[in-house]
Regions:
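Long, charged/polar, soluble alpha-helical segments
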Residues: 1-106
């Protein structure tokens, strides 16, 4: 699967999971969930153009975006884990791993 296809697939998964997190968690957990939304927004900014980026520029153009999104997910995961929402924190960890693997493949 191409980098651009994986990027879009991760974004789609992140957006779907974010919606589910809002359904599962109490209203008090919305601040960490906002970080999940921000991570999706970071990725969404390049979603349309990702397939048009020349192979040689993929790392320099996508790495900063992926790193920022990963950082936001990490902060959300830690906050949710601290609040006792381990299951959702574990699911966010899985999303982080998808981004990490994509970053390594750039």
């Amino acid at each position: 699967m191409s980098i651009s296809a994986r990027y879009r697939q991760i974004l789609e998964t992140l957006e779907e999971q974010s919606d589910r997190f809002y359904e599962r968690l109490p209203v008090e957990a919305t601040k960490p969930l906002r970080l999940v939304d921000q991570a999706a927004e970071e990725l969404q900014a390049q979603a349309d153009a990702v397939g048009e980026i020349p192979q040689i520029q993929l790392e320099s153009r996508l790495a900063p975006i992926i790193i920022r999104a990963h950082g936001k997910l990490d902060r959300a995961r830690v906050a949710l884990d601290d609040e006792g929402h381990e299951r959702v924190a574990g699911q966010i960890w899985e999303l982080e791993q998808l981004l990490y693997r994509l970053l390594n493949d750039l």
